[in-house]
């Protein structure tokens, strides 16, 4: 029992000791937690105080470390433009000064000494510095002390905006990294531009499809054979190129019956030409459907033909082209041999026969008609002799532009006749013009003459009349000269024998003429 009690006691003592130790340890832990809480608060307060002290007293290295971080602390000037704004440069210059204030010239000198880029470039960066100082609210103007005689003022940073310059970080451009990380675009997303050859083919196909869907009637097989025979004499490769260039806009429905007579004038094929016709596939046969219909017209898309786009789709097409009157020779054009005919504002239905005759009558040895160069129309000049076109239009019964007119319309064509005797130079033409004007403004000579040869002189006609008594006029003149007022005249003093009836002097002749008039 004693042993057990001893054991119990022995076992009990350690329990008490353990409990006492645990209580002591818990009290120590609580004390350490309180100390740690107090130390964390003290650390926060000390850090805040240090920050405020650092704002007031900062060295150059600490300013670079706070403003730009590690990048600016190890900054090496390479002569390139620094990757920061002008406001940041101004704040950096002011914070590195001794009194945290600088003049405008001091800011300039610090930027030049720190960055070589601004030392070599004296351009518009100084204006940018002045604009930032005057417009940015973070900078304040401070007057200089009264003791100093220097003019001007200092610039400092507003304490409310000081944190903006402390927490700022350098933002470098990552253009090189972004360009290197760009993935190459896949080929499926690439857009291939349409070639110049594919664009007109798509337009032609869409136009033919819309035409086939719009037409409801089909022409007879004889009309198809008659239309195909017009181009039977041409090679097969030319036929394929012409068929792809067919333009077929429909005419108004009111012209269906009236234009049926014009379709009958199409020349019929011969038996020999029908045997040489090329075979037409099923796909191509759809292109030849309704080709000879009166509502359609066929014009080869040549370089020397152009449709006038001034009319709507419902109106009939108008063709403006120039044909050569004699197309049998393929020699260059000469003005002495041929004449140009300007055919404008003709209905295409009226010119279809002209085009077909022109195609059928072409010389097979000459170059193809669709490759022939267009005939240039010579510029107008005052030396060309034009024949006036027919201005009077006899047909006035058509109310609408697309209505069919039974009467024949006068041709507006004008034949250009080139003058063969044009002047060689402008100087010669000007000389001829001046001579012509002088001949119109010619004034006959009005000088007096007594021989009666000048018919325009009235004095000569007066003296030549038989009723005029010249002897009596001379005697009266002698009596007049004997008057006392003419005694001292030079003529009387010169001749002592008195006044003689000698021929008059030229001066006296003028006086007589005036007196007679």
Swiss-Prot record:
Tell me the GO BP annotations in alphabetical order.
Answer: cell cycle switching, mitotic to meiotic cell cycle; meiotic cell cycle; positive regulation of transcription by RNA polymerase II; regulation of cell cycle switching, mitotic to meiotic cell cycle; regulation of transcription by RNA polymerase II
Biased composition regions of type Low complexity, renumbered to the chain:
209-223, 254-270
Q: Which InterPro entries does this one have?
A: Fork_head_dom, TF_fork_head_CS_2, WH-like_DNA-bd_sf, WH_DNA-bd_sf
Region (Disordered): which ranges? Answer: 170-278
Q: List, as start-end ranges, the regions of compositional bias called Polar residues.
A: 230-246
Which Gene3D superfamilies is this protein grouped with? Winged helix-like DNA-binding domain superfamily/Winged helix DNA-binding domain
Recorded GO molecular functions are: DNA-binding transcription activator activity, RNA polymerase II-specific; DNA-binding transcription factor activity; DNA-binding transcription factor activity, RNA polymerase II-specific; RNA polymerase II cis-regulatory region sequence-specific DNA binding
Domain of life (superkingdom)? Eukaryota
Q: What is the recorded name of this protein?
A: Meiosis-specific transcription factor mei4
């Amino acid at each position: 029992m004693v042993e057990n009690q001893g054991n119990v006691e022995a076992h009990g003592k350690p329990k008490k000791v353990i409990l006492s130790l645990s209580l002591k340890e818990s009290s120590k832990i609580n004390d350490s937690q309180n100390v740690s809480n107090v130390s964390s608060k003290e650390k926060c307060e000390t850090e805040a105080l240090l920050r405020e002290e650092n704002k007031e007293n900062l060295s150059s290295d600490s300013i670079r470390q706070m403003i730009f971080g590690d990048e600016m602390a190890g900054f090496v000037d390479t002569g390139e433009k620094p990757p920061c704004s002008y406001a940041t440069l101004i704040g950096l210059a002011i914070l590195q000064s001794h009194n945290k204030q600088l003049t405008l010239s001091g800011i300039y000198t610090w930027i030049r000494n720190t960055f070589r880029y601004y030392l070599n470039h004296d351009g518009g960066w100084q204006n940018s510095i002045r604009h930032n100082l005057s417009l940015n609210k973070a900078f304040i103007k401070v007057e200089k002390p009264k003791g100093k005689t220097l003019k001007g003022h200092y610039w400092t940073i507003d304490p409310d905006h000081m944190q903006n310059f402390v927490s700022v970080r350098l933002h470098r451009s990552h253009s090189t990294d972004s360009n290197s990380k760009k993935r190459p675009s896949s080929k499926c997303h690439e857009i291939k531009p349409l070639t110049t050859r594919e664009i007109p083919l798509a337009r032609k196909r869409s136009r033919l499809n819309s035409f086939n869907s719009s037409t409801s009637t089909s022409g007879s097989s004889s009309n198809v054979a008659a239309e195909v025979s017009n181009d039977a004499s041409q090679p097969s490769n030319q036929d394929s190129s012409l068929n792809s260039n067919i333009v077929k806009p429909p005419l108004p429905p009111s012209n269906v019956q009236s234009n049926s007579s014009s379709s009958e004038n199409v020349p019929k094929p011969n038996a020999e030409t029908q045997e040489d016709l090329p075979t037409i596939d099923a796909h191509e046969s759809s292109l030849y459907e309704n080709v000879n219909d009166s509502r359609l017209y066929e014009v080869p898309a040549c370089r020397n033909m152009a449709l006038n786009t001034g009319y709507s789709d419902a109106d009939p097409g108008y063709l403006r082209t120039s044909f050569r009157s004699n197309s049998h020779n393929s020699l260059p054009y000469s003005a002495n041999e041929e004449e140009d005919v300007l055919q404008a504002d003709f209905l295409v239905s009226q010119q279809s026969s002209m085009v077909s005759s022109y195609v059928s009558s072409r010389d097979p040895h000459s170059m193809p008609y669709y490759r022939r160069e267009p005939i240039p129309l010579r510029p107008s000049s005052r030396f060309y002799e034009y024949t006036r076109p027919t201005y009077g239009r006899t047909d006035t019964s058509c109310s609408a532009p697309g209505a069919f007119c039974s009467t024949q319309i006068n041709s507006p064509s004008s034949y250009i006749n080139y003058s063969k005797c044009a002047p060689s130079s402008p100087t010669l033409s000007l000389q001829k013009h001046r001579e012509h004007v002088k001949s119109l403004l010619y004034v006959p000579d009005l000088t007096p003459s007594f021989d009666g040869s000048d018919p325009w002189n009235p004095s000569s006609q007066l003296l030549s009349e038989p009723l005029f008594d010249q002897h009596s006029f001379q005697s009266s003149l002698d009596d007049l000269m004997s008057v006392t007022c003419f005694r001292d005249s030079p003529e009387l003093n010169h001749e002592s024998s008195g006044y003689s009836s000698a021929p008059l002097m030229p001066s006296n002749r003028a006086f007589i003429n005036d007196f007679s008039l």
